[in-house]
């Protein structure tokens, strides 16, 4: 591994990366101060999730149910949405108002992307090469598109782990723990990006094994390398069992397939294709972005070839073998998968359709571009101090272009239900289609602030507690009562301390028969076997990874 800068002297300090990262973040904060926060498509969803999670965590309850969604009827959002992004958002929400919490989230995610790419490329590249690669990766057009226009905060945070996974896979001596940890972090941050990362792992593993076979490596060595990739994948997935197992078991209890309706499937979002359900603006922006990426990659690879041909004598390569070929093949594959002829691949590869939008593959193309830039800058001699200034300037130029293209004007806050006067107290009312409980219908769903009964009450209904929900009814006679809460298999509903039979409703709300007396109804969340087994598997896997790391360190 190359641990020298362009001048050839060892550099052990952190001055250059710290200065470059600080300059890039200050530039981003300056744009936020100048423009205000951006109204991304999913901003209300995330602000509502963060606010609900922060409230529950302050009460000592691990979030499972988003009570404010679906006009107060609720949905099991936190069962299915990976926890790392909303846990970070909840922390930021307790420290700042909603708009500023979103700004800090974007800055922290950008810093994570910067640090991850710097670390991944610095293992073999010079300091200037790693600085430029990190700045381009963190402020690339697709990153700004995701953060400013889409407010896809989970996807943005998950981009932090992709360079770590890729670096572990292309390492000359990959380890199980180095593969397992970033893979697990991907699955705990964002499902579409985790699927991308899993296929990236599979692609690089096959590429590496094929290269070893072509070089006639011993069969035992090839088998050992395959075992490392397989073991890292298995342990990475098992490490997420506390989240992934309950989500898989409970998938039948919600309407996940509705996420792919109304133009949200891969067939409606290929490049160079427009359907009645496709957003023309998004298609135009993504196509332009793709053209810019392809042009930049071509220029970088041509420049690398020219520089290498002009060398007076062969120079030993410090980067992993066949990296340029791997990046070229990966870029071509990504480009193909964004075009309509690749529909058969999307249809038959397991879970690839969960990505919904083929242009999400631009996150991989961003990774390829950053690595290609590192390869290019690694071929030339640049002073680290000059590289710091160049990296900050590159970040500023990319952010300026991104702000002009993707920033959503805060003047449109009222249109999106985010007026400054009530943004701190706002709640997410609209239901999320894919998290709607099975059998429930969102059509005609209205706000219900309190329970309703078929007979009059002699006194107002009392709320005895919120977690668990306990209500006391004062009824004049036997009545059918409806709670402002949707039914879900994990709810245990008790009336007078006994399990209460429920009456089906079209909107899915809990409805039950109560006697003519003071009746206490309790609704409690029940932990299932999947939660217990999931936590046990995650803890056992964490212990296994610790033992792997200790064994590896002892032998080293």
Where are these regions (language model features)?
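Membrane-embedded transmembrane-helix bundle of lipid-linked glycan/lipid transferases
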Residues: 2-411, 522-526, 530-556
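Active-site-proximal, structured, solvent-exposed surfaces of multi-pass membrane proteins
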Residues: 449-555
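Membrane-interface segments at or immediately adjacent to transmembrane helices
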Residues: 408-470
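Intrinsically disordered, low-complexity regions
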Residues: 9, 14, 41, 322, ...
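Alpha-helical scaffolds flanking conserved acidic
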Residues: 133, 326, 446-449, 512
